[in-house]
């Protein structure tokens, strides 16, 4: 991550450990004889209730960092602890559980199911987590209300504005 900035909010002082703790994190890709250092020596701590923005020019390693933080990829070197657990020590099924229960993504293209309502799109992570239908409906509606879309729960993505689709994606990321 060359020439990249990490903008962080100023959370209230807390004695709790960081929920994200990276030390010397790096990722190298090898393609034939070419070695690409996509991420070099990143140190980052994120505390509970803290908001963080990862910014930088194209090719600076933002997506690589997000893939590592989201447990979609593994670092080539360094340490990444999520909730005090070293990610490198997790098995595939444990990583899948982390992605389903602890990490929410808002993708650039939102990745909403076109034929599903806003409510069903928000319910998806809860379905995968095995949450009962009643609780799933309640939690998804609550998440939609938190992003001011409770009144649009029965609309499909093509019936929503770009900003509304983005808020559905945010609700889906927050529902777990």
Question: Which residues does each predicted region cover?
Answer:
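Pre-NBD coupling/linker segments of ABC/ABC-like ATPases
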Residues: 1-16
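ABC family nucleotide-binding domain
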Residues: 16-176
């Amino acid at each position: 991550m060359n020439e990249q900035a990490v903008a962080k909010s100023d959370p209230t002082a807390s004695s709790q450990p960081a929920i994200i703790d990276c030390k010397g994190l790096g990722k190298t890709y090898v393609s034939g004889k070419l070695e690409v250092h996509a991420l070099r020596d990143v140190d980052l701590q994120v505390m509970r209730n803290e908001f963080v923005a990862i910014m930088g020019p194209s090719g600076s390693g933002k997506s690589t960092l997000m893939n590592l933080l989201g447990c979609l990829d593994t670092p080539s070197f360094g340490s990444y602890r999520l909730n005090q657990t070293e990610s490198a020590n997790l098995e595939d099924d444990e990583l899948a559980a982390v992605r389903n229960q602890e990490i929410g993504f808002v993708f650039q293209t939102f990745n909403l199911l076109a034929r599903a309502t806003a409510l069903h799109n928000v319910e998806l992570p809860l379905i995968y987590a095995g949450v009962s239908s009643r609780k799933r409906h309640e939690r998804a509606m609550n998440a939609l209300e938190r992003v001011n879309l409770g009144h649009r729960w029965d609309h499909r993505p093509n019936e929503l504005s770009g900003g509304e689709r983005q808020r559905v994606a945010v609700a889906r990321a927050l529902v777990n």
